Amino acid sequence: KPNKDKKISIICYNYPPGEANLFGGAFLDTFVSVSQILQRLVQEGYTTKALTPEELREVFTAGRAVNSGKYDCNWEGMIRYSTRNYHAPKEVTEHWGKAPGEIMAEEKEFLIPGVEVGNVLIGLQPARGRDSDQEQSYHDKTLPPHHQYIAFYQWLREEFRTDAVIHVGTHGTLEFLKGKESGLSQDCYPDYLIYDLPHFYLYYCGNPSEAVVAKRRSYAQIISYQPPVFEESDLYGQYLELSTEVDNYHQSLALSPAMAEQTL
């Protein structure tokens, strides 16, 4: 298939859910990274367009395409996936109730937070659980994913018909879903959701232990990235003023203790 006909899904994170935590990723400026990925895809002949980091941020914040927005949610702007096309293991219904459930759903449709830029989908990985138990459920390997989580990856495969998935940054939750540690089967949720899709994962090089989990449990091709370069920083603003006052105080102690008291 020529590049111009291929569809790519770029998946970013929104943890905890809401407007304040878009495009999270350890030691990574994810908006800049996704912008550069789009530029490279355009150069390689994919049907999409380049967006600046500022344009990407505007698309998701002004468009309110987020997981369970705390201030407002643009339900009309969400991609929708009908429950008529949805299928899930029995265990999911037993735990979360009848589809579509209460998380990112409206009537008989799932809400998919993301934008299509030509043949490229830039989406947000679903939250792991309800707002009240996000931290507890993040690495919980006994909790089955909720309906909208499963619907998100089904939509990528069956409706959007993606040719590859790229998870951007450390780290998401797909690789920590319920199932065996190795030798996964279709009864294991990472396998059930990613199955045979080509999967690329941008992962921080300082976290090889969890990168191995992503490789083993979600069949990811790991693309390592380095942390930002550390640089010496000068004082600025009130910190600079405070440093000057401290220096003046110590000089006054030696020359005129009375003036030192006035400095305090």
List where the protein language model places each region.
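Non-catalytic accessory regions outside enzyme or core folds
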Residues: 7, 255, 259-264
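Catalytic or ion-translocation cores adjacent to nucleophile or general acid/base/metal-coordination motifs
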Residues: 21, 25-49, 121-125, 132-254
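Flexible, glycine/charged-enriched surface loops at secondary-structure junctions
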Residues: 2, 47-55, 257-261
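Sequence-level motif detector for i,i+2 pairs with an aromatic at +2
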Residues: 5, 117-119, 218
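Extended, H/D-rich, highly charged conserved domains that either
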Residues: 13-124
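Solvent-exposed alpha-helices and their adjacent loops that cap or buttress functional pockets
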Residues: 2-4, 112-116, 157-159
